[in-house]
């Protein structure tokens, strides 16, 4: 090598040894630094592995706090008592016994949570994930009061009884949990299990007021990826206002027997997604009698009707486009009359259409993002109306 005078300098064995020692020392220091950073990271983010075999202690979920129910029922996981209320078709009878929109609120410091569920898991659809139709969807409240998704799970088989490990390896700190129930499976029992010695107690209801919502498959949550992603559920988590869902896929047609149920629902306000399923002729025949029945049952309470959304499947289907346009036009014309004729009746417009027109699963139902857009579009409209009635 060259020295400072441009002359060739021979590296002696001693210099080579010192260079090697310097290199080795630097490498050793680097290894120590990496190890120290690793230990610091582990200290900042400790691990709490769940034991392989846990003898869980179970509590029936109905002994905790159930929210989102429109009325009391003999089976706490049903939405409507189908012994008391008649007129439903076989499909409707099953739908109103499914706990769509119902959630369990509890507090626990358990490092893992197990579920024992008994129910009817027979319904299947290409457009709805099993995690939504059969699954349980867990959120945990953050320090700032917001809800953060934690974990979900669904039975993999249709056996009536199933045991599932919902979540594990959590820190043993107290957590406020919000567990959404399946949108299209009837439950006869749900037990929540925690580790021995852990606390499991009913949580305080996290949402205020009672706003009932009757609607179609959109309100039911069809094509959501998870049970807690319907637009009414997203609205509750975002605003803190409790929505009580009576979404019935394909069956929200302004029927008199559904009006009978809603007449008995004690709520602060009533929202309807009632123009998505019926055709124009049915809307024309049933809308005003439906409004008059509910106004008589709930005088002074707001009745808020939503126009149906644009279905992406109609873009190139000329027949579907004509049908959809006809019922939207009928809803517009009749609701223009209704809001003038009836006090406390309102009409709002949702929008689930993304800029690229891709927020759909099957051309009819939005995906999670589409339902988020729906929720965002009605939020300011609903809040403005609800505020007039002291619902904030």
Predicted regions and their residues:
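A short helix->loop->beta-strand "cap" motif at the edges of active sites that frequently abuts
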Residues: 298-302
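Substrate-gating cap/lid alpha-helix
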Residues: 311-349, 392
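Short hydrophobic segments within beta-strands
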Residues: 115, 214-215, 306
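Oxyanion-hole/transition-state-stabilizing segment in secreted/luminal serine hydrolases
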Residues: 252-293, 297, 308-315
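Histidine-centered active-site loop/cap adjacent to the catalytic His
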Residues: 361-392
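Serine-esterase "nucleophile elbow" of acetyl-processing enzymes
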Residues: 44, 169-171, 177-252, 256-266
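N-terminal secretory targeting modules
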Residues: 15-24, 41-210, 384-392
